[in-house]
Amino acid sequence: MERRLVPRSAELMSQQDTVLLVIDIQEKLIGKIENAKRLVWNVRRLLDGAGELGLKILATEQYPKGLGPMLSELAEGIPQIPSKMMFSCRGCPETIEQIAGCGAHKVLLCGIETHVCVQQTAFDLMASGYRVYLAADAVGSRFRMDHELALQRMESSGVTVTTTEAALFEWCEVAGTPEFKRISRIVREPSPTSFADD
């Protein structure tokens, strides 16, 4: 008799239903962000994992004339990075249209600053009916209190707060596959020793 698996929880992200949205990680702002090196490392891992698994990857820039472009080490492979003046990514209609167009109903956010562009985007996406996830180790603010209170506010309002590693394994779902081997390599990547300098 064949055993049937129970259905997968709707709480979990998958390769098929999730978009990765990278918010405003720009040259002239990142150096002011607490734990910036760790944040960039985790965003790089999310980008690598999403690329390996075929997730849709989107990114934005906030006022690049003043804040500079997206970090080049993260921008590689992202074909279009629209700019905005509005803090929320709803200020980039093309980005919202791409999320809607790919059929995803979950969005994982990473980027800066937690309490401004990330938080406002999270609430606007929720208001539009999306399930919003946040990689807490891949977002940041200049000041710790702003970051921590924004995480609390978003979580209490229904945003699912997670981590980079948890997200990668959720997307992967099962072990013993070629995809799992690629994700495992990303997860096992040693963290830079320079984190102590943050």
Model-derived features: positions:
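Active-site-adjacent betaalpha module
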Residues: 2-19, 52, 65-198
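A short alpha/beta connector and helix-capping loop motif
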Residues: 15-18, 33-64
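N-terminal nucleotide-binding beta1-loop-alpha1 segment
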Residues: 19-25
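Active-site loop/turn elements of alpha/beta-hydrolase fold enzymes
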Residues: 25, 62, 137
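Short acidic, Gly/Ser-rich segments with clustered Asp/Glu that frequently serve as metal-coordination loops
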Residues: 27-32
